[in-house]
């Protein structure tokens, strides 16, 4: 694991949750250029509203992010906004930095007020425990996650070594367009505000916005990137070679984290990748891939190892994309092999036992060849199991 210069991390148990860590802080020695992408849900949690306001005013002066898990601080009215601000104010006081340099985030049960005495005590403890180890922070932001999600990447730009580190949480309520997931990316790159915003948006569109666990979109989701410039490179501007090199590093981090979220889907036993090939345009390819990976009927078919290919074609049909259904070829693929199940929009004879063997693997790929263009899109998801119902039926207990 590589850690970018100038960043430190902490995670503590402040008793919002009964046992596990539940409050984390990321801190930069110097002000950072920052950018964020937030939930598309009309119902936005207090921390989302607060952070959007702060980033609008101070996108080049962020020093810290404080995150709690266990309580979402969503649907909490004016008191929720007061509590979000109190989180920032307490963090600023303990770190001796301006309050407008602090972002906040929450994840957990909706409609419950934050226990602010516990939160403020946790902030004090977390500041004392800041270190170069990001693992405690990764543990502190988990809710129904079963494992931490961290990935890092090094890249050399104009002779300067730059590090990108991402930490995410998410396993349920994951649906295309940012849903119940938090991701915090830190880098020591020196990058302009406009370039940072652009590369984050492009990357999120092809990573977190192309995954699905259960079709729900959360009130709290956000991806935040902080760049403190301590790598010492010349400021990276839009559309330069340096921009695309940094983008590739950031996108690898986001893509790996997105796949880790899918792999940790609540109750999941299989990861599903959908690849739409030779589509008439990129938007159609994305719409179709997302519709297929989000289909509960497709998810349950994969769980049951049932090559029910009609569900895939049906999902493509209601995606909103316009295409000729009589030209579609469909394949299932895994480490056990590959099988064609439809050609030119109609079923073909195939061996059911072979298909079941292919679908029995932990990673299954659905390939839809549209034969109507050259565009490609991929989306990722997981199967839907009885365990998912069990986990979410007992979420508050």
UniProtKB/Swiss-Prot annotation:
<comment type="pathway">
    <text>Amino-acid biosynthesis; L-arginine biosynthesis; L-ornithine and N-acetyl-L-glutamate from L-glutamate and N(2)-acetyl-L-ornithine (cyclic): step 1/1.</text>
</comment>
<dbReference type="GO" id="GO:0004358">
    <property type="term" value="F:glutamate N-acetyltransferase activity"/>
</dbReference>
<feature type="site" description="Cleavage; by autolysis">
    <location>
        <begin position="179"/>
        <end position="180"/>
    </location>
</feature>
<keyword id="KW-0808">Transferase</keyword>
<comment type="function">
    <text>Catalyzes two activities which are involved in the cyclic version of arginine biosynthesis: the synthesis of N-acetylglutamate from glutamate and acetyl-CoA as the acetyl donor, and of ornithine by transacetylation between N(2)-acetylornithine and glutamate.</text>
</comment>
<comment type="subunit">
    <text>Heterotetramer of two alpha and two beta chains.</text>
</comment>
<dbReference type="GO" id="GO:0006526">
    <property type="term" value="P:L-arginine biosynthetic process"/>
</dbReference>
<keyword id="KW-0012">Acyltransferase</keyword>
<dbReference type="InterPro" id="IPR016117">
    <property type="entry name" value="ArgJ-like_dom_sf"/>
</dbReference>
<keyword id="KW-0068">Autocatalytic cleavage</keyword>
<dbReference type="Pfam" id="PF01960">
    <property type="entry name" value="ArgJ"/>
</dbReference>
<comment type="pathway">
    <text>Amino-acid biosynthesis; L-arginine biosynthesis; N(2)-acetyl-L-ornithine from L-glutamate: step 1/4.</text>
</comment>
<feature type="binding site">
    <location>
        <position position="143"/>
    </location>
    <ligand>
        <name>substrate</name>
    </ligand>
</feature>
<dbReference type="GO" id="GO:0005737">
    <property type="term" value="C:cytoplasm"/>
</dbReference>
<feature type="binding site">
    <location>
        <position position="266"/>
    </location>
    <ligand>
        <name>substrate</name>
    </ligand>
</feature>
<keyword id="KW-0963">Cytoplasm</keyword>
<protein>
    <recommendedName>
        <fullName>Arginine biosynthesis bifunctional protein ArgJ</fullName>
        <ecNumber>2.3.1.35</ecNumber>
        <ecNumber>2.3.1.1</ecNumber>
    </recommendedName>
</protein>
<dbReference type="InterPro" id="IPR042195">
    <property type="entry name" value="ArgJ_beta_C"/>
</dbReference>
<feature type="active site" description="Nucleophile">
    <location>
        <position position="180"/>
    </location>
</feature>
<dbReference type="GO" id="GO:0006592">
    <property type="term" value="P:ornithine biosynthetic process"/>
</dbReference>
<keyword id="KW-0511">Multifunctional enzyme</keyword>
<feature type="binding site">
    <location>
        <position position="392"/>
    </location>
    <ligand>
        <name>substrate</name>
    </ligand>
</feature>
<dbReference type="InterPro" id="IPR002813">
    <property type="entry name" value="Arg_biosynth_ArgJ"/>
</dbReference>
<keyword id="KW-0028">Amino-acid biosynthesis</keyword>
<dbReference type="GO" id="GO:0004042">
    <property type="term" value="F:L-glutamate N-acetyltransferase activity"/>
</dbReference>
<feature type="site" description="Involved in the stabilization of negative charge on the oxyanion by the formation of the oxyanion hole">
    <location>
        <position position="107"/>
    </location>
</feature>
<feature type="binding site">
    <location>
        <position position="397"/>
    </location>
    <ligand>
        <name>substrate</name>
    </ligand>
</feature>
<feature type="site" description="Involved in the stabilization of negative charge on the oxyanion by the formation of the oxyanion hole">
    <location>
        <position position="108"/>
    </location>
</feature>
<feature type="binding site">
    <location>
        <position position="169"/>
    </location>
    <ligand>
        <name>substrate</name>
    </ligand>
</feature>
<keyword id="KW-0055">Arginine biosynthesis</keyword>
<feature type="binding site">
    <location>
        <position position="180"/>
    </location>
    <ligand>
        <name>substrate</name>
    </ligand>
</feature>
<comment type="similarity">
    <text>Belongs to the ArgJ family.</text>
</comment>
């Amino acid at each position: 694991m590589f850690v970018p210069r100038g960043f430190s991390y902490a995670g503590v148990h402040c008793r919002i949750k009964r046992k596990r860590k539940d409050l984390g802080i990321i801190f930069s020695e110097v002000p950072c250029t920052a950018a964020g992408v937030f939930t598309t849900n009309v119902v936005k949690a207090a921390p989302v509203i607060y952070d959007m306001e702060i980033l609008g005013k101070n996108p080049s002066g962020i020093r810290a992010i404080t995150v709690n898990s266990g309580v979402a601080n969503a649907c909490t009215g004016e008191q929720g906004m007061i509590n979000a601000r109190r989180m920032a104010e307490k963090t600023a006081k303990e770190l001796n930095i301006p309050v407008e340099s602090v972002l906040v985030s929450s994840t957990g049960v909706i409609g419950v007020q934050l226990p602010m005495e516990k939160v403020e005590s946790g902030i004090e403890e977390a500041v004392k425990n800041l270190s170069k180890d990001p693992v405690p922070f990764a543990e502190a932001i988990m809710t129904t996650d079963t494992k931490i999600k961290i990935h890092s990447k090094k890249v050399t730009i104009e002779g300067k070594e730059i590090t990108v580190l991402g930490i995410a949480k998410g396993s349920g309520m994951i649906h295309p367009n940012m849903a119940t997931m938090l991701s915090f990316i830190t880098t020591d790159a020196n990058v302009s505000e406009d370039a940072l915003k652009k590369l984050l948006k492009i990357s999120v569109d092809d990573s977190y916005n192309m995954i699905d666990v259960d079709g729900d979109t959360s009130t709290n989701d956000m991806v935040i990137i902080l760049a403190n410039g301590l790598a010492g490179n010349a400021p990276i501007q839009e559309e330069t070679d340096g921009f695309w090199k940094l983008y590739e590093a950031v996108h690898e981090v986001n893509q790996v984290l997105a796949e880790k979220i899918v792999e940790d889907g609540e109750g999941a036993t299989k990861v599903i990748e959908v690849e739409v090939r030779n589509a008439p345009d990129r938007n159609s390819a994305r719409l179709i891939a997302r519709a297929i990976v989000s289909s509960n009927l497709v998810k349950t078919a994969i769980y049951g190892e049932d090559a029910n290919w009609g569900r895939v074609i049906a999902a493509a049909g209601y995606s909103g994309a316009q295409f000729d259904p009589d030209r579609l070829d469909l394949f299932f693929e895994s480490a056990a092999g590959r099988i064609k199940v439809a050609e030119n929009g109609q079923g073909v004879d195939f061996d059911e036992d072979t298909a079941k063997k292919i679908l029995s693997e932990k990673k299954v790929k659905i390939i839809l060849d549209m034969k109507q263009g050259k565009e490609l899109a991929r989306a990722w998801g997981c199967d839907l199991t009885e365990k998912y119902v069990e986990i979410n039926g007992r979420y508050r207990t």
